Amino acid sequence: MDADLYGYKWARDNVGQSGATIYRLYGKPDAPELFLKHGKGSVANDVTDEMVRLNWLTEFMPLPTIKHFIRTPDDAWLLTTAIPGKTAFQVLEEYPDSGENIVDALAVFLRRLHSIPVCNCPFNGDRVFRLAQAQSRMNNGLVGASDFDDERNGWPVEQVWKEMHKLLPFSPDSVVTHGDFSLDNLIFDEGKLIGCIDVGR
């Protein structure tokens, strides 16, 4: 990996809450911008999950290209190309009146993601799996009242859990999803949504 990193300037990327350490690599003549993501402990597993999902999903969607991946028992490093452009969040900040166009583009992109046949997806992120993850986090004291939106601000964790279960559909409609379909993970270039990042979930 050292040869791939030589000659770049480095800048820490503090966007997101994945727990991974992320660097943007830039400024190398005639070379693309890159991102280096490092995870330790359980976060190393998340970085590994992202590498595996990038490998699979690249057949269907525009994604960063994997340049290098290293895994040790306690660490993982993932080096990828950067998708040129700006995040949807950055576009909305720069052009506040573009909200309707951004929403339309997100809807088209999400439909494209949902159109991938579920039978082709080797990963399980269904509600049973996600609820088990959420319950484990609750049981380990990793969820607090400050994590909730304004409507549920100050609610006990157990109350939010019960209310959430009341909203679950009787029979789920399974589709391929992005585990963090947020404005910071969707990339626009020249007014078009051209790709997504952070596909570890």
Residue ranges of predicted features:
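ATP-binding pocket architecture of kinase catalytic cores
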Residues: 12-123
